[in-house]
């Protein structure tokens, strides 16, 4: 596998560098993080470059550039300090609707292409159904030609401001044999109550509880096929886990470079601290983890472009990168010392963000279970 960037990919990476150098984005990110606000102005700038169209097929006005290109862009954005976790719906969110949605649903979502605005997210997790997705209690019930949605969701990303949510629910008329179906829900409908939650990290993307009280839908609001809810979201889980891993790597690389620059200029005991062997040991271990993450992610991206990526690959990336990246950021914070914990350094934001990623998008434990099954399956 040759991971040298082609001309198109080099242009994207160069464009990212130019954008990130165009203004003090870090001040904007710090403000958005402090106020728990989605950085729409930044995402709009990326959309103007075509970043939200990287995976959209050419016949739908996209670039069809592939996952290796997505990886190159995400890695560079992260290295330069951008909160790529706010972009999870951009690479594949449009394609999900092109593949599964009705024409009306497709038109509503594709209208967001190029805008930088949040458009939709999935609502699966519930108070009693986290990793145990099969314990979902939210129901849809048909009555007098309408469909009524009842139940509660929690920890739903982007849901404070996104105009649409795809809700996983079980058929209320089939309690003994659960049928799980997704529904395309306009968040302005009566009966929906949203409660925004505070988070340790990833603050630029909202996290909410959502209650549905007899929310009236039509049959045309069904998303995909009835009873196919679980099968569809499995692919979405793999996609999300790969993107989370890319974000983890980029963030860790940024922290590593910040710490390296600091170590080479901070003087103690008459020498720069980078001359001390204990500090050098930290950088050696950080470099090993970063190199391992990068190679793993580029191989996974290549597999995705060639149609051979598996759920095991995605779980491996998510687990390893979430943990390795957190270790890198934690070590970088140790190098920075008081600057890292008492000042306004972005390392504190990185540390908070990466700790969340060992839970969100699938916990460490669920990634290990998924990966273990996938590994052994190859030898049956």
Curated annotation (Swiss-Prot):
Cell division is among the record's keywords: no
Main location: cytoplasm
Catalytic reactions on record: 4-(trimethylamino)butanoyl-CoA + oxidized [electron-transfer flavoprotein] + H(+) = crotonobetainyl-CoA + reduced [electron-transfer flavoprotein]
PROSITE patterns: ACYL_COA_DH_1, ACYL_COA_DH_2
Species of provenance: Citrobacter koseri (strain ATCC BAA-895 / CDC 4225-83 / SGSC4696)
EC number, as in UniProt: 1.3.8.13
Name of the protein in question: Crotonobetainyl-CoA reductase
InterPro entries: Acyl-CoA_DH_CS, Acyl-CoA_Oxase/DH_mid-dom, Acyl-CoA_Oxase/DH_mid-dom_sf, AcylCo_DH-like_C, AcylCo_DH/oxidase_C, AcylCoA_DH/ox_N, AcylCoA_DH/ox_N_sf, AcylCoA_DH/oxidase_NM_dom_sf
